[in-house]
Curated annotation (Swiss-Prot):
The lineage of its organism: Bacteria, Pseudomonadati, Pseudomonadota, Gammaproteobacteria, Pasteurellales. This is Hydroxymethylpyrimidine/phosphomethylpyrimidine kinase. PANTHER family: HYDROXYMETHYLPYRIMIDINE_PHOSPHOMETHYLPYRIMIDINE KINASE THI20-RELATED, PHOSPHOMETHYLPYRIMIDINE KINASE. It comes from Haemophilus influenzae (strain ATCC 51907 / DSM 11121 / KW20 / Rd). The keyword Acetylation does not apply. Belongs to the ThiD family. GO terms for biological process: thiamine biosynthetic process; thiamine diphosphate biosynthetic process.
Amino acid sequence: MSNVKQVLTIAGSDSGGGAGIQADLKTFQMRGVFGTSAITAVTAQNTLGVFDIHPIPLKTIQAQLEAVKNDFQIASCKIGMLGNAEIIECVADFLADKPFGTLVLDPVMIAKGGAPLLQRQAVSALSQKLLPLADVITPNIPEAEALTGIAIVDDISIQQAAKALQKQGAKNVIIKGGHSLNSQSELCQDWVLLADGRHFTLQSPRFNTPHTHGTGCTFSACLTAELAKGEPLQSAVKTAKDFITAAISHPLNIGQGHGPTNHWAYSRL
């Protein structure tokens, strides 16, 4: 398998295994790419919540990135939890010359249980430093609102937010609809704005389950894997949508709270 594609995740570690680095590597494995990692923070968490966050020293983050760069041919890279402005600036400076191919930015801000994973003052650093480097950004609705200052209440405002993210530098925008504009809707709709101005939506059934921990990480990791394999963005987004839909709709029922998704589900359909 000398032609296996190599990818990188830059994110936090989740001791509960449902999100972050752990979810990314599981997804990479299931999608047939070789995953490498640079850990930005170690979190103590499980399905019930986040109990401690320990940011990794900047020199250690940079050393991880250097180690990956010097030995692997990374076709695409995803960024997840960064935690604070200093880490954002460290990562952005390293990625300035795009050493890791296509860059997918998942602007992780809040854990599924509500715990903040990005300091409030770091949002502007994310907008100014990383958005201009992103080939694709994958915020959910609350994250898109935080990055743009636009209250997303309908289809018009979600389009405005997507265009605002493009103006900040992101080339392609995917606003995920898990946090529905209509809480009674039976559908989950993602809104996609491509670099050339075309846009489309992707729909899936909405499932009444608490086991959605790590959905954003898993979606963006699958997208990263498909882009590494050379899939066009529209096709890659569709695969990522199908992958996470399968993962949510076949829950593992692990833990006492917001449990993880099922990374095996898509391959077993």
